[in-house]
């Protein structure tokens, strides 16, 4: 499966086209809208979330609530477009107006300057409109479709926040993914540890008061994936590599780890690798899950556990020093409307991109065209693994 997205942050709409989604999957707009609503929540979001109420329109690939196997077109309108029709006009506008609206002061940490250099733009709005995290809206929409595939296969995905602004969750004693989801859905910062959540919100408030921003760490867990999904044969077929790329492709994400992650560098091998055990009921499994569900680029049958590091958002209300590309004079960087912390929302985006990669690998491995055949083949693999 693959998808492409199109659209600018303040353009009329965002669009994604999904290719390779198998036929026979039950898919309704409400499945996608539920995920879009989750993305818009979260402590520390900016004023734009008060303007937008994201809702999807499905324009192709679905009939009578079932996918057809043909490309699926999803569109989310930007309600704020009405205030930007002149600035973001497709047609040429008056040159004086264009000069007045030009963005010539690149923001440190953003795509502004590099994009202007690459594409030859003298107005960096041509860069920042597309590089904006607003694009993740339709990535979440794509992820919602992937989640529907996984749900049909008995695979569950859950994302949550484990750190914001140096405040780390200590309590992680949830008994199931269902409990984790129930608690984090009620948390303003999507954190299971209620005491840590309060301190996280205080850190966000402090950053906002100072015109600053803060980042954090999110974790995504996937349960129910059979062993052997992915491949050791080629670098580009390793599923953990695909998930790592997907996580780092999210706006402002700068690092990724699986299982105990970078802690593995500080431990001896005897405290890193997961011992293999066998039982008649489960077949081969692992005593621990320090590898985060992967060995050799393939799933082990244990839960996939992946974490991503999100840097603070580079748009600051107390902007850093920059240089105007026209005058070459030092100035403070441009200010765009933004969040002081988007880590809670980013956990939803991380869920979406991980779900897409896992679903895509399963569809590729177990039959690409029909959901009923994919279900049969996944169950066969589960039985085979138990009896191996």
Swiss-Prot record:
Instruction: Write out the residues that bind FMN.
Output: 130-132, 251-252, 296, 311-315, 337
CDD domains with a match to the protein in the record: Chorismate_synthase
Checking InterPro entries in the record gives: Chorismate_synth (IPR000453), Chorismate_synth_AroC_sf (IPR035904), Chorismate_synthase_CS (IPR020541)
Give the signal sequence positions: none
The record's listing under PROSITE patterns reads: CHORISMATE_SYNTHASE_1, CHORISMATE_SYNTHASE_2, CHORISMATE_SYNTHASE_3
Which PANTHER family does the entry mention? CHORISMATE SYNTHASE
Q: Tell me the protein's name.
A: Chorismate synthase
What is the organism of origin for this protein? Geobacillus sp. (strain WCH70)
The gene is aroC
């Amino acid at each position: 499966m693959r998808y492409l997205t199109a659209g600018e942050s303040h353009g009329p709409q965002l669009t994604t086209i999904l290719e390779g989604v198998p036929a026979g999957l039950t898919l309704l707009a409400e499945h996608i809208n539920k995920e879009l609503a989750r993305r818009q929540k979260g402590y520390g979001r900016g004023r734009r979330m008060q303007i937008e109420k994201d809702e999807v329109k499905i324009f192709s690939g679905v009939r009578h609530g079932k996918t057809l196997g043909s490309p699926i077109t999803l569109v989310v309108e930007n309600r704020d477009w009405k205030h930007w029709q002149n600035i973001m006009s497709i047609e040429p506008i008056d040159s004086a107006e264009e000069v007045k609206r030009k963005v010539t002061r690149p923001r440190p940490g953003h795509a502004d300057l590099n994009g202007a250099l690459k594409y030859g733009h003298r107005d960096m709005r041509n860069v920042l409109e597309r590089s904006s995290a607003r694009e993740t809206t339709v990535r979440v929409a794509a992820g919602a479709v992937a989640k529907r595939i996984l749900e049909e296969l008995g695979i569950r995905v859950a994302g949550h926040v484990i750190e914001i602004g140096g405040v780390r969750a200590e309590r992680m004693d949830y008994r199931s993914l269902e409990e984790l989801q129930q608690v984090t859905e009620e948390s303003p910062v999507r954190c299971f540890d209620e005491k840590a959540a309060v301190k996280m919100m205080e850190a966000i408030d402090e950053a906002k008061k100072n015109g600053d921003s803060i980042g954090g760490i999110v974790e995504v867990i996937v349960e129910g994936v059979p062993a052997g999904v992915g491949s050791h044969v080629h670098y580009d077929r390793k599923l953990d590599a695909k998930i790592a790329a997907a996580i780092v492709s999210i706006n402002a994400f700068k690092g990724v780890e699986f299982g105990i992650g970078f802690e593995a560098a500080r431990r001896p091998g005897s405290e890193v690798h997961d011992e293999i055990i066998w039982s008649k009921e489960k077949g081969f499994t692992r005593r621990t899950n320090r590898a985060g569900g992967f060995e050799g680029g393939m799933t082990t049958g244990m839960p996939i556990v992946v974490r991503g590091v999100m840097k603070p958002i580079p748009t600051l209300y107390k902007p850093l020093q920059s240089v105007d590309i026209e005058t070459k004079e030092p100035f403070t960087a441009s200010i765009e409307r933004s969040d002081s912390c988007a880590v809670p929302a980013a956990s939803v985006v991380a869920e979406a991109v991980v779900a897409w990669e896992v679903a895509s690998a399963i569809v590729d491995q177990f039959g690409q065209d029909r959901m009923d055949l994919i279900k049969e083949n996944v169950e066969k693999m589960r039985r085979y693994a138990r009896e191996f």
